[in-house]
Design a protein with these regions (language model features):
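Charged, terminal alpha-helix-loop-beta segments
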Residues: 1-464
């Protein structure tokens, strides 16, 4: 008679949706076969070519560039340097939203030398007169268009900084800081200062940061003139509608579908830090969600078997079967680990790459930058009964955290002198203020170290 685990594995293998998902995530996109699936330059080249629209048989209203402009309008508020104003003039914005903007593409190029755009900026600065070496900085995607029909606007220039697995570059190395006030600045600050020097009253300049990250309220670029957009925005707004349209030949549709796979698949043949899913179709998001719902018990048993082996604990009868299950389904498990959908499971993240964890026998997936925030929510729920109404809320929770981690470090980034952060009636806002200091950098490293050494009964932290 089959054991419980054997029966679960039999049922797993019989399920057509499980087999379908396993087959999908065992595939390799053409970019992965070439070893460039997470390299920035090929993605920049792909989008530069697509935005030209040469392979798309449609009018300007349905062109990829028009829909790209729609994404910028939708995300313009992330460029917080403009305050309550907009980087896109009102008349132009109306034309973009109505898809009536009359533009003529003059140039779209990947890896455009910045000196070709801002030569005067580099050649006329008296502080750099003794610098003989040209600036070799490159703009990932450069777009220049002539504009007609918008009062006072004749040119549109878009500078796109594309980041796939890396963050924005900081100042150049000391030995390469030839131009004080430029080379010693972060990447987006350099690009904005140089390109903005060519601005004029009849030209609109838009600066864009493209990343796989979920777009928040404010751009993550150091220079806040950059509108932040995501690959998910481009997938939803440009690629998927194109596939369903009549604007493509079969060959072109196949090429775009293959690029969608590039975004969808976690690329297992490269180092772990680059195993990210850049964007996900609704179909795949739903498939992963349903996969976890169907197989939650089996996945938890498999993960516990893996932990027992790593810790040298006594194996159970079916552990070998469960370990073989993990090995044969590693592609699907990596897809789970790289997912960032809150409705899938609770996400707690290690900040570097996707991993699957067990917390109190519940399956958890680590894959985005909300580790600290979600831990703090959990910590608060477990300890809120200890809070006293006659004492500052943030101070109390902060003291509990310091005791938990055995450190004197303050864990929240609120202003101590601001009375509103000590209003015990305003606990939701206070808790929100504390969340902001938990997600990245040294705090995250301390948080993970603390969890590995000080886990209480209510929080068992296990890594697969």
């Amino acid at each position: 008679m089959a054991t419980k685990i054997e029966q679960m594995l039999i049922e797993y293998g019989k399920n057509a949706e499980n087999r379908k998902l396993q087959t999908y995530y065992s595939r390799k996109s053409y970019m992965e076969k070439l070893g460039i699936a997470r390299a920035e330059e090929p993605h920049s080249a792909y989008w530069a070519n697509l935005l030209k629209g040469d392979d798309v048989n449609c009018d300007k209203k349905e062109s990829p560039l028009m829909w790209f402009l729609q994404v910028l309008v939708n995300r313009e508020t992330t460029a917080t340097a403009y305050g309550t104003t907009s980087p896109i003039p009102a008349d132009m914005k109306i034309s973009i939203i109505s898809r009536t903007l009359d533009f003529q593409i003059e140039e779209i190029k990947a890896e455009k030398k910045i000196k070709e755009i801002a030569n005067k900026y580099f050649s006329t600065n008296p502080n750099w007169s003794n610098v003989s070496e040209p600036c070799e900085d490159e703009l990932d995607i450069y777009i220049k268009c002539a504009i007609r029909g918008v009062l006072g606007i004749e040119k549109l220039e878009i500078i796109v900084e594309n980041k796939v697995t890396q963050k924005e570059n900081g100042p150049k190395a000391k030995k390469n800081q030839l131009r004080p006030g430029y080379d010693d600045k972060c990447q987006t600050v350099r690009y904005y200062n140089a390109c903005n020097s060519t601005s004029s009253s009849n030209k609109v300049q838009l600066f864009v940061l493209l990343t796989p990250d979920t777009t928040g309220i404010e751009t993550t670029a150091t220079d806040k003139h950059f509108i932040q957009i995501s690959y998910q925005d481009l997938l939803d707004t440009i690629l998927l509608p194109l596939i369903e349209s009549d604007s493509l030949l079969d060959r072109q549709r196949f090429e775009i579908k293959d690029y969608v796979d590039v975004l969808n698949l976690p690329t297992l043949d490269i180092k772990e830090s680059q195993r990210i899913i850049m964007a996900k179709t609704t179909e795949q998001a739903d498939a992963i969600h349903n996969y976890v719902d169907r197989n939650r018990l089996l996945l938890c048993e498999a993960l516990k078997a893996k932990i027992r082996k790593e810790k040298g604990m006594n194996s159970l009868t079916d552990d070998d079967l469960l370990l073989k299950f993990i090995d044969s389904n590693k592609n699907v498990l990596w897809a789970l680990a790289c997912s960032s959908y809150a409705n899938l499971v609770d996400h707690i993240v290690d900040g570097k790459t996707g991993n699957i964890y067990l917390i109190n026998d519940e399956l958890k997936v680590y894959g985005d930058a909300t580790f600290g925030q979600r831990f703090l929510e959990f910590f608060y729920e477990q300890n809120k009964h200890l809070l006293k109404d006659n004492l500052p809320f943030c101070d109390q929770l902060n003291d509990m955290l310091k005791q938990f981690f055995g450190t004197s470090t303050s864990w929240y980034g609120v202003k101590n002198k601001d009375p509103k952060h000590y209003n015990v009636i305003d606990k939701d806002n206070d808790l929100s203020a504390m969340f902001g200091n938990f997600g990245t950098g040294q705090n995250l490293a301390k948080l993970i170290k603390g969890l590995n050494t000080n886990s209480p009964d209510w929080f068992r932290f296990e890594k697969l």
